[in-house]
Amino acid sequence: MKRVDRNLTKEILFGGLRWYKKIYWILQHTAKKRDLKTVSPQVRAALILGTYQIFYMDRIPDRAAVNESVEYVRFKSEAGAVPFVNGILRQIARRAEYFTKPDKKNKPVEYLALQYSHPDWLVKRWLDRFKFERMETMLEANNQPPPVFIRVNGAKTTPMDLQESLLRDEQTHSEKGNLKGCLILKKHPDMSPEGLFARGFYTIQDQASQLISYLVNLQPEATIVDAAAGPGGKLTHMCEMGQGKIKLIAVEKSGPQMERARQTATRLGHDTNIEWVFSDFMDYTPKDKVDRVLLDAPCTGLGVLRRHPEGKWQKAESGIKELAEQQKKLIEHALKMLKPGGEMIYSVCSFETDETESQMRWVKSTYGDQVEVVSPVSRLPDYFKRYVTRENVLMIYAGNQDDMDGFGAFIIRWKGAP
């Protein structure tokens, strides 16, 4: 499949997932008495993806969206459903979005959940924290494809030189991000073996994720444990920032993720001074106490729904509490590894209170004088200090002004037993 076809296919599939709830609502109103749950998954998929193209992709003519969806159904040996699919999609193509929606004022949860295609439980949860207007911004942001942030490999090039190379060699325009060494590509990168990516001139990493390495105080001779090293973004960023003067212990329990991290490190030329440990973090204990632990903890991923739209429909509210308990165990294990004066940097791709601020408060209440909260303000570039809360937690919400992923992070210094 050509790159342009692959990108278009991904856009349609992800779009169908992002707008699933609203599309299903439109389809069910159009189908009227026919319950869509009774049709085959193939027919349902054709209807959803066809409707997405009609409503959200201006560059695809409605006629083409209808015809391709019908041919897909025919190809999947669902010939009997062809008239049904053809009829439904043609009705949708002829009409504007005219069905009566829930009232915005009296039923804000139902309105937002439908208008922006999010599960009701998540909208209700967030509406308890955020104002209606901000909610609209956040939910809309979750439905937009993320920008392509890249991290320039300073060992091989400079941002300016890479911008010139991208334009000259790959006809890719880019602009500078607000973080040193960060660029934003204007189209999908060239992933071919001879491309600049494959040759290690840059790696793909959201700007919010790049910020986390700034929180790790990378002093010379420091030993740092990366508790979940795959796929290698933060690991290799620390390698570059440490300039070969730090020792990294990369812990990863997933074989494929470990391999990805190794490949990323090799591709970027940052594969020295790394000790690779194939293990669950909870089963790993270093020989000696360490200076830093970067705990990029398992989380709900509610800050990266624009990257993983299927997550909206796969997650349940009960899972937040369960993950929070798991995170506490990982935090306890991480703190045991630290020398006096050592630091744990905790991060998640979520802005849920249970996974961020509440975790920091729990650490303080549990360990008292044995720990100290270090403000991220002391580590971050000036521009990004605006994202630090009064409680000294880095909190990046969906729909932020810099179009970054949602993230949360804090720093705990281990003072030792009193």
Provide a role label for each language-model segment:
Residues 1-418:
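S-adenosylmethionine
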